[in-house]
Structure formats: structure tokens, C-alpha cells
């Protein structure tokens, strides 16, 4: 822990003096090393499936610190074999010293990147909800001396964003905050009611060609906020253009996870390019470097005590999506489009 405090202090000094003005790229240079620091793990077989994962551990020798866990869930096609789930995104940046230092109260966190069993043609299907919970429970037991069970966070992109929402709906007591990115699921009102006390940070690209911003993502946000008891704590990040932190276009408007991977800051440590951030009351939110997504996450705790799940969770709730009625979808699309145009 002493090493982590020294590292955090040096990073703070460098940021204040301007030495670290290109912090994002300094971290990016360490990305390969960060990915190599992840270890392999696998959960117990549950309902016929065992979820494997790779994880980063912040624990040092003789370390008694309690660290939060960040669960990261990949998108479709990014989990064909073990270890592949951290390759398409830059989530490994969160394992670097700079990003680890942003976790409030611990100056570090476990990063657990789980894998959907795509070789079985499973893309975060509902049948993996309980096996994923079992893998998380097992990880907590194996690392009980250093896990802060009151600070478990979950996020992911595309199909992983869908699974983020479904896990939170199935087990709302477990997660202190969640951060779905371009989630490929439109939860119904019975589902979003179960998220009422969970802070949610939703991120999406306005031009997303796969998960439509206006008919899917904005409607998901509206449904969540309509039921939320913590509106002021919720965040909605909209990316007019989906860019890398240096302002260059990503390969697709679907790739909004890079903004989250870089903690919503540009290469110059300013606002992430082409982004807009609001809270659940519609108020614009200004981020001040280095307090981005990580600082937001780590500021929340839950009452979860680490008790293992006794069953498959609330299957009725996590299976309930919003109506697929075409007319309703079209209405939502234009309602949200006009709101975006006229309200900004």
C-alpha cells in the first residue's frame, strides 16, 4: 500500500506541475504491459456453464487494503477464446498506475473481465446470468481478505451493456453503481424499477449504427430515470461523434466504450471530444480532471455483505424487456430525436 501512496503522490505532483499534461498517452504507452498483468480465472460450473475471466489484482505483499471490484463485460464477437475479452477495448488502462490512483479511498481496484461462452454460441444470453454471478461470488471468496464487497461495480459495452443491465436487475443489492455502454437491450418498466436505487452512468454514440441512440438508448435512459430515486447521481454521456481521446474518429459510431476506457477525458486532460454529459435531472455536468468515470464509480457504496446468491436471481425481472411494438419504437425514435434537436 505504501508503494501505491507514493505513486499517487507523484502522479498528483506531475499533474499539478504540468509534467503529466499528456497523461492519457503516457498510460496508452503502458497498455500492452497492463494487459500482460491480467491473470486467468474461472468460476464454478453453474447450471451447466462455467464463466472464465481475466483479472487484474492491485494487492501488494502484506497489503491489508480492501479494494473495490470492477466487472467488465465485452461485446458480441469479442469473447471467442479466453483472454480475448480485453483485446478490442482499452479497459486494461484501468490497471495502470495512473488510473488505479483515481479509485477513491483505496487507490486501486480489481478489474475482472468476464467472458461470454461464444464458442457455445452464447452472447451474454440469460442462461449465463447465474453462472456469471457464481463466478463473481467465487472470486470474492478467493480474495476475501482484500475485497470491499460494498463497492462492486459492473459495466460493459453492446451485448456486455445488455448483460450489465440484466445483472443489475437480477441482483440490485450487489452493485454500488453500474455503467452500461451502448447497451443492446431496452429494459421494461418492471426491470428499471429494480434499478431505482442504483446510480447509473449510461454512454452512447448519437450515430451508433447498431444500437440506435434515439429508439433504444435514449428510451432506456428515460425509463431508468422515470423510476430512479437517485437522479442527481445518474449520468448520461452522449457522443455526437465517437472519437478517440486525440479527436480522431473511431472505426465505428458504435465504439463509444473508448470514451469510458479513457475515463471521459481528452488526450490533453480536458473534456472528452464531441461529448455531452447530463445528470438524471437534465442538468449539464462538467468533469474536472482527473475525476471522471472512475471517481464517480468509486464514490458509491452498497449494503451488500458478500452473501452468495442462493438461486438464479429474479428471472422474471431480468427477462422483461420493453415492448417490441413497431409503432411504439417509431414514436420513441421521433420523440427522442426532436428532444435531442430542440433541447440540445
Q: What are the residue ranges of the model-derived segments?
A:
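Short alpha-helix in the alpha/beta-hydrolase fold that links the catalytic acid
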Residues: 84-85, 212-224
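Cell-envelope and extracellular/periplasmic
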Residues: 73-80, 116, 140-141, 157-159, ...
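Active-site machinery of serine-nucleophile hydrolases
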Residues: 69, 73-133
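Gly/Ser-rich "nucleophile elbow"/oxyanion-hole loop immediately N-terminal to the catalytic nucleophile
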Residues: 60-65, 120-158
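C-terminal catalytic histidine-bearing segment of alpha/beta-hydrolase fold enzymes
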Residues: 203, 207-209, 215, 226-340, ...
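A domain-start/cap signature at the N-terminus of enzymes
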Residues: 23-69, 155-157, 162, 167, ...
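Sec-dependent N-terminal signal peptides of Gram-positive bacterial secreted proteins and lipoproteins
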Residues: 5-24
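Primarily recognizes the serine-hydrolase "nucleophile elbow" in alpha/beta-hydrolase
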Residues: 150-194
Amino acid at each position: 500500500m505504501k508503494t501505491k501512496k507514493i505513486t499517487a503522490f507523484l502522479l498528483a505532483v506531475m499533474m499539478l506541475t504540468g509534467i503529466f499534461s499528456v497523461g492519457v498517452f503516457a498510460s496508452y504507452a503502458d497498455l500492452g504491459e497492463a494487459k500482460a498483468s491480467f491473470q486467468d480465472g474461472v468460476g464454478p460450473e453453474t447450471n451447466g456453464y462455467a464463466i472464465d475471466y481475466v483479472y487484474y489484482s492491485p494487492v501488494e505483499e502484506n497489503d491489508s487494503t480492501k479494494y473495490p471490484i470492477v466487472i467488465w463485460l465485452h461485446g458480441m464477437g469479442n469473447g471467442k477464446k479466453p483472454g480475448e475479452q480485453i483485446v478490442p477495448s482499452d479497459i486494461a488502462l484501468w490497471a495502470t498506475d495512473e488510473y488505479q490512483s483515481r479509485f477513491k479511498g483505496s487507490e486501486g481496484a480489481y478489474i475482472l473481465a468476464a467472458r461470454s461462452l461464444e464458442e457455445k454460441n452464447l452472447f451474454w444470453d440469460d442462461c449465463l446470468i447465474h453462472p456469471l454471478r457464481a463466478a463473481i461470488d467465487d472470486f470474492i471468496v478467493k480474495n476475501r481478505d482484500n475485497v470491499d464487497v460494498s463497492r462492486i461495480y459492473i459495466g460493459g459495452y453492446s451485448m456486455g451493456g445488455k448483460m450489465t443491465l440484466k445483472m443489475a436487475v437480477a441482483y440490485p443489492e450487489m452493485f454500488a453503481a453500474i455503467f452500461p455502454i451502448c447497451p443492446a437491450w431496452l429494459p421494461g418498466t418492471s426491470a428499471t424499477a429494480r434499478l431505482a436505487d442504483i446510480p447509473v452512468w449510461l454512454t452512447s454514440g448519437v450515430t451508433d449504427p447498431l444500437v440506435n441512440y434515439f429508439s433504444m438508448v435514449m428510451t432506456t435512459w428515460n425509463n431508468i430515470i422515470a423510476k430512479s430515486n437517485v437522479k442527481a447521481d445518474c449520468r448520461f454521456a452522449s457522443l455526437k461523434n465517437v472519437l478517440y481521446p486525440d479527436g480522431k474518429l473511431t472505426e465505428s459510431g458504435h465504439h463509444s466504450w473508448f470514451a469510458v476506457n479513457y475515463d471521459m477525458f481528452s488526450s490533453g486532460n480536458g473534456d472528452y471530444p464531441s461529448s455531452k454529459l447530463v445528470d438524471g435531472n437534465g442538468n449539464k455536468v462538467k468533469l474536472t480532471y482527473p475525476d471522471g468515470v472512475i471517481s464517480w464509480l468509486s464514490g458509491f457504496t452498497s449494503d451488500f455483505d458478500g452473501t452468495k446468491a442462493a438461486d438464479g436471481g429474479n428471472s422474471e425481472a431480468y427477462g422483461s424487456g420493453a415492448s417490441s411494438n413497431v409503432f411504439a419504437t417509431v414514436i420513441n425514435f421521433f420523440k427522442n430525436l426532436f428532444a435531442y434537436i430542440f433541447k440540445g
